[in-house]
Amino acid sequence: MANVIKLRKGLDINLKGKAAEELSTVKEPGFYALVPDDFPGVTPKVVVKEQEYVMAGGPLFIDKNHPEVKFVSPVSGVVTSVERGARRKVLNIVVEAAAEQDYEEFGKKDVSKLDGEAVKAALLEA
């Protein structure tokens, strides 16, 4: 069981000195992985295949118990591997990032004209 620390009012840590005011640039990683174990209570069902192109915002896997909940790709690119462990448990889904990012379009909706169910459906779609 993981130790979960809950902060209610925050914590101020008094440190001497001041942080250096410098910015550094980092190279974008070429591979991104989505790990279903990072989401407690989720039983993943993979909806993409290896070597399939996905757009940023496109679903990689869904929750078997709640199929309306989708877990999407952070970048567009090719799914390089779907790693499985014992008893075919999904360990991670690796996406190789494309040079140009393509994003899934969900359209614009006027929230003031939608009812509660339509807003919920739009949020679950995205």
Model region roles, listed by residue range:
Residues 1-47:
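N-terminal, Lys/Arg-enriched amphipathic/low-complexity engagement segments
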Residues 54-68, 91-99:
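Short hydrophobic beta/alpha edge segments that flank linear recognition/processing sites
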Residues 18, 37-42, 54-57, 66, 70-81, 85, ...:
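Generic structural motif
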Residues 83-126:
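Buried, small/hydrophobic-residue-enriched core segments of structured protein domains
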